[in-house]
Amino acid sequence: MVNGVLLLHKPVGMTSHDCVMKIRKLLKTKKVGHTGTLDPEVSGVLPICVGRATKIVEYLTEKSKTYDAEITLGFSTTTEDQTGETVETKPVNHDIDKADVEKVLNSLKGKQEQIPPMYSAVKVNGKKLYEYARAGIEVERPKRMITIEDIALTTEIKHHGETASFRFTVTCSKGTYVRTLAVMIGEKLGYPAHMSHLIRTASGDFSLDECFTFDELEAQAQSGTVEEHTVPIERALNHLPKWIISDTLAKKVENGALLETPEQFSEMTSGDRIAVFTESGTCLAIYFPHPAKKGLLKPAKVLMQKSEQ
């Protein structure tokens, strides 16, 4: 049984759910889940949790994402990307330069509000926005706070008749729509715009050069070497503070017991999480401050129980 994180190089044309279903069939297990939706037309890093690792999906989903994006100035679309129908056009002047673009990109760094596109899976009143959009109904969309950690121009500006395009890289918080970011960039430059290409190059610490294609995963499955190529749960959680405990405490953790907060974690707040490890290096659980009992830690997830060892 595989227990870990598969780093998939998601191909264009598949939904994230399609990828999960294919891996379930490939590995003959239902315990498979992805860690952050990628639109069908977007390729790149898609971490897939398998086996016990499905318990840590939420902790990987929270990580920042990095994208390589292309924006086309000159016309906007219904979907904010290259798949939609044209909404507005405006010929692009050839005097737009790198300095203009870099100034706009730098202005986007930090926290800001973003309204998700109508063609998205965000739910309003229990229904996905794209379902409203396909029915020709526009609804009020909830604003969300996002963080642009870094953004930079990576190519020259290329002019194509009445349009222009350039590429940029962006590292952003979960839930950021790069399509919408492209539209914002266009607005700040004075032009209708859309995202014409997107690839996710990193998800947290996982990069594209670590990922495997479906063909490679199928070959690993046939040779019985999938486990050798998965990221262990312990590495996947290396962004969390680590607490190494004694074998005596480990037995309590396996049973989901409350633990006294050690001195080094006395400043933890309610939103903090720590990964609890055995002396031999196995991650047993994730703990957080007990909401009602000061000085105690409560298990958020028990990853390894005695029966599984």
UniProtKB/Swiss-Prot annotation:
Keywords: Isomerase, tRNA processing. It catalyses: uridine(55) in tRNA = pseudouridine(55) in tRNA. It holds the Pfam family TruB_C_2. Gene3D superfamilies: Pseudouridine synthase. GO terms for biological process: mRNA pseudouridine synthesis; tRNA modification; tRNA pseudouridine synthesis. It is an enzyme of class 5 (isomerase). Its EC number is 5.4.99.25. GO terms for molecular function: pseudouridine synthase activity; RNA binding; tRNA pseudouridine(55) synthase activity. HAMAP family: TruB_bact. Responsible for synthesis of pseudouridine from uracil-55 in the psi GC loop of transfer RNAs. NCBIfam families: TruB. This is tRNA pseudouridine synthase B. The lineage of its organism: Bacteria, Bacillati, Bacillota, Bacilli, Bacillales. The gene is truB.
